[in-house]
Structures are given as structure tokens and as C-alpha cells.
Amino acid sequence: MNGYDLYISMDSNIQQYCEQAAEKAYIKKQADEVSVIVMNPQNGEIMAMVNYPEFNLNEPFTLIEEMGADGTESADKKQELLNRMWRNPCISDTYEPGSTFKIITLAI
């Protein structure tokens, strides 16, 4: 059975730059989290998407330090922290970029 082709629009150079910028902003501003999306305004393609802090995909059940875990959490609390860690704020949070995005759109 023939399958369908999958084409991605991610640009590895833009992705790497966004990851570095997100980490830098996280540290400099002492933010709780940083999310970045770079999108092509002509067609809506996502060129980069970053959430920081990020977790190790090879160890998805190990809580990252930034989650505030100290190893004494109850099972329910640990599950809550894991769900929060796995969540992708770029696509699941209801906050919209709003006016901060208009500047970028205007520049294009």
C-alpha cells in the first residue's frame, strides 16, 4: 500500500537561532518560560517553533529542574508536572501574540 509524502517547512538554521535566542532570553529576563514561532506570513508555514525550557526527549519521565520538582512529589503532583512539561505552549496556550506580532507583520 502506497503512503503519502510528508513535507516539512522547518528550517534548521532558523530553528537553531530561535533555540539560542530563547535560552538567552530565558536567562536574561529570568522568565518562567519562553516560546517562539517563526511563520511565513505568505502561506502560514511554520519555519521554527521553540519552547524553553525544554525536556530531554530520550528521558521523557525525568522532570527538568525548572519544573520545581525536588523528588518528594506525590504521584498526582508528579503527573501534573509531567503534563505541564510535555505541553507545547506555542500551540496549546490561549495567549495570542497580538500587538507584539503586528510589528513583525508591518516590517514584511
Regions found by a protein language model. Give the residues of each.
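Active-site loop and adjoining helix of the penicillin-binding protein/serine DD-peptidase-beta-lactamase fold
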Residues: 2-42, 61-108
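Short glycine/threonine-rich beta-strand-turn micro-motifs
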Residues: 43-47
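Short beta->alpha transition motifs characteristic of CBS
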Residues: 48-54
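Extended hydrophobic/aromatic segments used for targeting, binding, or gating
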Residues: 55-59
